[in-house]
Amino acid sequence: VSTKSFSLAELAEFLGCEYRGDATHRVTAIAPLSDASDSQITFLAQDKYLAQLAGTSPGIVVLREKHAAAYSGNRILAADPYLAYARLSALFNPRSSLPKEIHPTAIVDSSAVLADGVAVGPNCVIGANVRVGQGTEIHAGTVIGEATVVGDNCRLYPRVTLYDRVTIGDKVTIHSGAVIGADGFGFAPSKTDGWVKIEQLASVRIGNNVEIGANTTIDRGALHDTVVEDGAIIDNLVHLAHGVSIGEGTAIAACVGIAGSTTVGKNCLLGGAVGISGHLHIADNTQFHGGTVVTRHVSEPGSYASAAPMQEVRAWRRNSVRYTQLDEMAYRLRKLEKEQ
């Protein structure tokens, strides 16, 4: 928990914003709008939360200029209060760093090259011909396979696994339990030998400024690398199959599954539990709402959904029965139209 203290004037200068109120008033933490106290700063990002502001007394509120009259206390006027909140969160709670040393329990191959300022935590394993860039932190229990390259200022949290020949760019964060570069799911059926494994000959390339959530898995490609481009963000429990390509700046929420050789364009938004079939192309700036099942190419940017919204269970059962009768109903309707 942060023990830092900042004045209204200091925070406004940090954000590059104007302020109103007591320049010397200090706060020590960020809090939700609904219950922020005099020693805390909060933010108002949307009109629908104005009622909450009326019922609370925060030390400082970050809000848009159009909302400035809604609060008479200390306030910072920001064009984007939510973005301001993101920047403040790092100011109040900077992440702790590992000591810039190799822990004595770590196993580092003699051919591995670790740049200045690399930190390696307990029980890590770093394989042959690995290269790790300046300022990167490798937390406890992480395994980095042979000939893998990790860029500058990355952070690999405990128990990350990077298989052989994976390439990670600069300023990449990978959370605990993520596995990058495991074999893609490739097998050829044989009448005599069952499923014959197809060796996955390519690898995984992760760009710069990427964040990958806990227990996410990104498989290596069969013949073409699996690619995540610069600035993409991937939540927990996501699976990218072999040969998938994720465009620059795309955001993927939890539990998404993308089948092999699909290309997702730049600046796309994928809601939770979206499923995308293989060998598809998704246009830049496409948005899929949570639970959407994608089975065809999307060539036009837009907002798409396919999941049925929640209903009361009795209505859902009736509608489910009717859904199974649609083909018969359509046949009967055509028959009636012909008879008229």
Regions found by a protein language model. Give the residues of each.
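Structural signal for interior beta-strand "rungs" in well-ordered beta-sheet cores
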Residues: 43, 101-312
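Terminal amphipathic alpha-helical/low-complexity segments used for targeting or macromolecular assembly
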Residues: 1-105, 166, 171, 177-178, ...
